[in-house]
Amino acid sequence: MSERKYFGTDGVRAVAGEFPLTSAWVMSLGAAAGEVLRRVNPHARVVIGKDTRQSGDMLEAALAAGLTSRGVTVIHVGVLPTPGVSYLTRHLKADAGVVISASHNPYEDNGIKFFGADGQKLSDATELQIEAAIDEVPGFAPLTGTAMGSVTNYTEAEHLYTDFLKSHAPDLSGLKIALDCANGAAYRVAPKVFQAAGADVFAIYTTPDGRNINRGCGSTHMDHLRQIVREGEYDLGVAFDGDADRALFVDSRGQVVHGDHMLLLNARARGEQAVVATIMTNMALEAKLQDAGIPLERTAVGDRYVHERLHEKGLSLGGEQSGHVLFLDISPTGDGVLTALLTLASMKKLGTTLDALHDDLVMYPQTLVNVRVQDKKAIAVDQQVQQAVRQAEEQLLGRGRVNLRPSGTENLIRVMVEGQDAAEIHEVARVLAGVVEARGQA
């Protein structure tokens, strides 16, 4: 595959206003994407949605200008969760969808992510075509008059997406639920859906001002939600991130119920043939699934890898501890509000509670040591390191596991050891990290 210049695993991300997320570059991106799309369909239509960041307006306008300059019709759906844009792209039979969001990042950051007509992440091949076309934008033949595209505001977007979510909501009557909407894209949708399902809802962080998204709130800052649930005697709490593609729970005691817990509960309730998770997923989940006769498949860290494995194996359920859970039989992308609703449906089906789930799945101790090295690629093939890993695995056989992986951004090797005995795994990690450090400086 060709080397990417702009697109990462989750689209284009940067500080808004700095390259590449300047108005000029984003307009070129829109023109390039429009040109690629109109080669397939001269009357292409693109859905654009965003989260609540202040920079979203500027990026949305620049992107729409570029797209319409190449004859594309732009459909604005306004502030909507990322999965809502995926849903509207499919529902409106558009040629593509675009989300302007940086998920759980601070408000200064933003990003641009494309969906295909199927509501899934745009294919690598199409992204590479768009990247190549960006450099060609100055040479595009200008379109004038009726050849230019137009912009429409689709005012029914939130209503349609909310109806979709309601169709998958269980009866939540009698449940007292606190919601943390992160001052993000779910600030209107989530409370509406949970109230419509019959829950007694108390929603916090529902007053976005363009700068307070994810600030001390949401699924990466859950202390306030935990306090509210404990002190207010709520049955549970749910926290979303800025673009609401993931969700985490809090049980009635204020304890966090994360993705591993959700995978176990949903796998049991839905009778899944297998579950896909990552190398960071706790062994305790694997053991519990094994008890239920459900195998666990592991992938590299990242929801895209979970998604790929689910497709390869024809499976439905997968996810990460972060609360990014996929139900591919219902939605082609992670959806925090949907995940929360389906998890509560599974809870009701099994007649259990999040408190009981938290107590049932006791996580194995896990230790992570970051070791700075000169060449992280060399460590991956170093024979002495490989021998040390084999020895560690033999020592932990049946009681734990070892994983070494390079940092994606720094010259670090992350040494992760997990097992039933905390003292043992700390000693194994110490010895293994020592070998990595010695070889990393050799």
From Swiss-Prot:
Keywords: Isomerase, Magnesium, Metal-binding, Phosphoprotein. It is an enzyme of class 5 (isomerase). It catalyses: alpha-D-glucosamine 1-phosphate = D-glucosamine 6-phosphate. Binds 1 Mg(2+) ion per subunit. CDD domains: GlmM. Gene3D superfamilies: Alpha-D-Glucose-1,6-Bisphosphate, subunit A, domain 3 (3.40.120.10), Alpha-D-phosphohexomutase, C-terminal domain (3.30.310.50). Mg(2+) binds at residues 103, 241, 243, 245. GO terms for biological process: carbohydrate metabolic process; peptidoglycan biosynthetic process; UDP-N-acetylglucosamine biosynthetic process. The keyword Metal-binding applies. The modification Phosphoserine is found at residue 103. The active site is at residue 103. Its EC number is 5.4.2.10. The keyword Cytoplasm does not apply. Its cofactor is Mg(2+). It comes from the Bacteria. One of its GO terms (cellular component) is cytosol. Activated by phosphorylation. GO terms for molecular function: magnesium ion binding; phosphoglucosamine mutase activity; phosphomannomutase activity. Catalyzes the conversion of glucosamine-6-phosphate to glucosamine-1-phosphate. Belongs to the phosphohexose mutase family. This is Phosphoglucosamine mutase. The gene is glmM.
